[in-house]
């Protein structure tokens, strides 16, 4: 077999679950926790976990009673459940717990930027779950 003309990208099938749910979103949450710890200390990470644990029960929504303690063992469905609430969970944590690393105005802007990043992620994720796209929807992915 002559593999010099093999296009590996045409030979593989994209797997949204492993790429988006278990890959990128997992990384985004893990990195956010590291940033919170660096900017605000462990108290901000603990508050994030507490907020996740205090989400009221709702049919079909996974409750994270231990926060993100077991994030390495989360399933794609658990990450999708977290996507539904995470934008609300992180809002205000930086404003509340920022240390001397930034002033109040910068903390407010950073907090808002983090919330917007998760909001934009959710919009992109929902769009990517579709089978077919309109040209206008694809324009939203451009930087």
Language-model-detected regions and their locations in the chain:
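Alpha-helical bundle/repeat cores within regulatory domains of eukaryotic proteins
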Residues: 100-143
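Domain-level detector for long, ordered catalytic/regulatory cores in large eukaryotic signaling
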Residues: 1-85, 92-93, 97, 101, ...
């Amino acid at each position: 077999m002559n593999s010099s003309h093999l296009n590996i990208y045409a030979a593989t099938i994209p797997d949204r679950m492993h790429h988006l749910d278990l890959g990128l979103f997992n990384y985004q949450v893990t990195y956010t926790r590291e940033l919170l710890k660096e900017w605000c200390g462990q108290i901000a990470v603990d508050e994030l976990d507490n907020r996740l644990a205090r989400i009221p029960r709702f049919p079909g929504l996974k409750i994270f009673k231990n926060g993100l303690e077991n994030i390495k063992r989360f399933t794609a469905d658990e990450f999708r459940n977290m996507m539904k609430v995470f934008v609300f969970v992180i809002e205000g944590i930086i404003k509340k717990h920022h240390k001397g690393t930034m002033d109040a105005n910068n903390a407010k802007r950073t907090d808002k930027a983090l919330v917007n990043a998760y909001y934009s992620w959710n919009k992109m994720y929902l769009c990517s779950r579709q089978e077919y796209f309109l040209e206008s929807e694809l324009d939203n992915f451009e930087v």
